[in-house]
């Protein structure tokens, strides 16, 4: 098992040819490692210009070095970010040098894990980081950014505070009936009912967030040759499905996604549904897949 608080490092930009690459170091040895490989003295929370050098003082690259003192950093620890030129050869050379000086490669998501363990973010914000990285539309990015900023966290904390206050009032009235005003049962029931509505709202918003993040599944369903594939191609604005006058041309489900005003719509073309006894084995399997598509759809568009 890895030590949760040793010093870790990773390339945090795509490893491909580009103008800039970024390497992050996080942990108590971050600054010491940076001092060993950076050509100049550096200041915390300043933009520092210089060179990365190896043990023989040979220059590897001209870089910008950004040190962040914990807990005011992404992970809550001492952090150093090194902006290099975007050559994979250069980036890997610097990463290897950092490892030689005592850091280890971070596991997937470990910087965010440390931010969570150091109470920089809560679980909802940690999940929002991944949602933001994987967002496929403006709406999903906005939703993730809202949660990263603490919207869901604040909603839950406010709800928790109110429920604890209600609980404390009830317990105090039971344990100290002579010293505490009697609790109005109707008042408590009314407050609890309001809180249940707030919980339902949070749960409904979570379901809506799933639609925003993963898209809405819309299946085109109907008998063979009613125009499902033609409509599918029209919606996509290019010929994705094969269209012929022959019944049963579409044998399997075909899924394509479009971005409609910031929302993802997953259009699903399906095999025509008809009496299986009139279909061959391959078409029968396609019909079964169409039925599964119906069960997994958010919206079903029947064509006749």
Where is each model-derived feature located?
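Short, surface-exposed connector motifs at secondary-structure boundaries
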Residues: 78-79, 298-300
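Glycine/charge-rich, flexible interdomain linkers and switch-proximal surface loops
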Residues: 109-117, 147, 151, 207-222
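Long, non-coiled-coil amphipathic alpha-helical linker/lever segments
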Residues: 120-198
């Amino acid at each position: 098992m890895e030590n949760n608080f040793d010093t870790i490092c990773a390339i945090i930009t795509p490893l491909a040819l580009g103008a800039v690459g970024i390497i992050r170091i996080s942990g108590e040895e971050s600054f010491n490692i940076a001092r060993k490989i950076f050509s100049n003295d550096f200041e915390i929370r300043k933009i520092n210009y210089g060179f990365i050098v190896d043990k023989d003082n040979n220059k590897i690259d001209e870089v910008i070095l950004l040190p962040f003192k914990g807990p005011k950093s992404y992970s809550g620890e001492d952090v150093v970010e090194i902006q290099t030129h975007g050559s994979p050869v250069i980036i890997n050379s610097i990463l290897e040098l950092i490892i030689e000086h005592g850091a280890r490669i971070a596991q997937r998501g470990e910087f965010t894990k440390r931010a969570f363990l150091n109470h920089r973010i809560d679980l909802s914000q940690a999940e929002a980081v991944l949602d933001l990285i994987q967002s496929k539309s403006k709406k999903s990015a906005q939703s993730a950014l809202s949660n990263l900023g603490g919207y869901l966290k604040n909603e839950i904390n406010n709800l928790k505070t109110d429920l604890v206050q209600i609980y404390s009032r009830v317990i105090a009235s039971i344990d100290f009936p002579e010293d505490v005003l009697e609790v109005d049962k109707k008042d408590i029931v009314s407050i609890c009912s309001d809180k249940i509505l707030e919980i339902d709202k949070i749960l409904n918003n979570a379901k809506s967030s799933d639609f925003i993040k993963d898209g809405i599944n819309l299946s085109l369903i109907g008998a063979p040759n009613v125009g499902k594939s033609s409509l599918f191609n029209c919606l996509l604005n290019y010929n994705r499905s094969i269209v012929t006058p022959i019944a049963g041309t579409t044998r399997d489900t075909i899924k394509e996604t479009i971005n409609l005003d910031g929302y993802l719509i997953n259009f699903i073309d399906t095999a025509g549904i008809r009496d299986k006894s009139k279909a061959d084995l391959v078409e029968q399997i396609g019909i079964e897949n169409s039925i599964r598509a119906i069960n997994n759809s958010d919206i079903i568009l029947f064509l006749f």
